[in-house]
From Swiss-Prot:
GO terms for biological process: DNA damage response; intracellular iron ion homeostasis. It comes from Alteromonas mediterranea (strain DSM 17117 / CIP 110805 / LMG 28347 / Deep ecotype). Residues 77-177 form the Fe2OG dioxygenase domain. Its cofactor is Fe(2+); L-ascorbate. 2-oxoglutarate binds at residue 168. Its EC number is 1.14.11.-. The keyword Chloroplast does not apply. This is PKHD-type hydroxylase MADE_1018490.
Amino acid sequence: MIIIDDLLTKDEVTQFRQQLASVPFNDGKSTAMGMAAGVKNNGQADAQDSRVQQLANALLSKLGNNPTVISGALPQRIFPPCFNRYSESQTYGYHVDAAIMRIPNTPDVLRSDMSMTVFLTPKEDYEGGELVIQTGFGEQKVKCDAGSAILYPSSSLHKVTPVTKGERIAAITWIQSMVSDQQMRETLFQLDQSIQSLVNVGTAEREQLDGLHHVYHNLVRKFSQV
């Protein structure tokens, strides 16, 4: 799991929420596939609304230019973001995201390697509504500040606990990575973050950094599928 702090600025979060306050939300079950429909109880912004499409495009632009998203996911394709809303008592039980998704209004499909939630409601404004992800270390509960995001493997079982007070609004999307192997993708992320840390602290010689960059890019070249 990768937490991305301040993916959106406070002003951007405010703009997103103001726009979403005026768009229609449909029953989230209408977009659930398979068994997920039986445990999904939320609202989802109408993806055909031009205002929602503008917000989705704005978020896509932010994702495509975020260094942590690029490093952690190595994106090949990103699904147009969806916006959901959980009011009091609404929840989404344990489910796994579909492996293959058709990109709306195109003949293209996407393999979901990584899932992302971008939190748009300040966490102090609602109770409950935690994203719970099953990992090899047990359940991990996530509730980020507004504007922050979490990136995690799409193969994970996960749920959103019932909102007991207030309202939770978030954006969700899925990413097809150039590196489909989860373990190798995580290793590449760790290597890249270590290189960036050495660059930032200025303790490594240029020759050493060149050597590490050489290893990193050759590993990406070997394991990527484009």
